[in-house]
Regions:
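Multi-pass membrane proteins that catalyze or facilitate reactions on polyprenyl-/lipid-phosphate substrates
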Residues: 1-271
Length: 271
């Protein structure tokens, strides 16, 4: 993977990371179009590890929300109570991804480069988003995130382990299925991305090192490629993250997912 390919793929990942589309799915499609060997071990690692840039974007832009929860501002809770509730719910929502991610790791790895599967999932996801607002938004009036709701959303998030399925779409729909408002569901999805993507990145790095693939990081320009991808990703990813809590997913945005789904499906189905 050369530097031009790295830059293009990183920009695509940054632009799609915080939208209800599959950033990984779009990356795989673009990698295929650019002639990148998507079965290559380093490319698979790059596809996951580059999302570390998204983590940095969220933490840098919303660090106050991580250290000064909204409930403190509104006076609903004391500082330490609000901090405990915020992180405890994130932990509960992350547990399913940890358990199922480890259990189905082989399936995820073997299908990460499956362009046909990715294409189909993008198409199905795009079509589903056209109707999910009508299906789940009726009666959505809750803003309180209970531990039970956090756990259910965490399990629904695991559907995104299928390459081409959007993590943010899964969690937002999961929240709305629990009668949370779109805003409340999107906010939890936004913050849940941090521990989830951080865990996925750590797992990928661990697998590379423990299976003797750690040398891949220092092979040729691989390490520089990872650094370049993460840095390039920061700008578009940061722009998306900056408006993430203010321009929450709505029906007009679904067009982006449908477009991506059709694009990916047409390409994938011909391979």
């Amino acid at each position: 993977m050369d530097f031009i390919q790295t830059i293009i793929i990183s920009i695509v990942e940054g632009l799609t990371e915080f939208l209800p589309v599959s950033s990984t799915g779009h990356m795989i499609i673009v990698e295929n179009l650019l002639g990148v060997d998507i079965q290559d071990k380093f490319v698979n690692a790059f596809t996951v590890i580059i999302q570390f840039g998204a983590i940095l974007s969220v933490i840098c832009l919303y660090w106050k929300r991580f250290f000064y929860p909204e409930a403190v501002k509104t006076g609903e809770k004391t500082y330490w109570k609000a901090m405990f509730d915020f992180y405890a719910r994130l932990l509960v929502g992350t547990v399913p991804a940890v358990v199922l991610g480890l259990a189905f790791n082989d399936f995820i790895e073997s299908n990460l480069g499956n362009v046909q599967l990715v294409g189909w999932m993008l198409v199905i996801g795009g079509i589903f988003m056209l109707f999910c607002d009508k299906i789940f938004n009726k009666g959505s009036e809750q803003t309180k995130l209970t531990y039970k709701r956090a756990l259910i959303i965490g399990f629904i998030q695991c559907i995104a382990m299928i390459p081409g399925v959007s993590r943010s779409m899964s969690t937002i729909v999961g929240g709305m299925s629990q009668r949370l408002t779109r805003k409340a569901a999107a906010e939890f999805s936004f913050f849940l991305a941090v521990p989830t993507m951080f865990g996925a990145t750590c797992l990928e790095v661990y697998k590379l090192i423990s299976h003797g693939g750690g040398s891949l990081l220092t092979q040729g320009n691989n390490l520089f490629t990872l650094i370049l991808g993460s840095v390039v990703h920061l700008r578009p990813g940061g722009d998306r993250a900056a408006g993430g809590l203010h321009r929450l997913p709505a029906v007009p945005r679904v067009g982006a997912d449908v477009h991506g789904g059709i694009f990916g499906g047409e390409r994938g189905l011909h391979l």
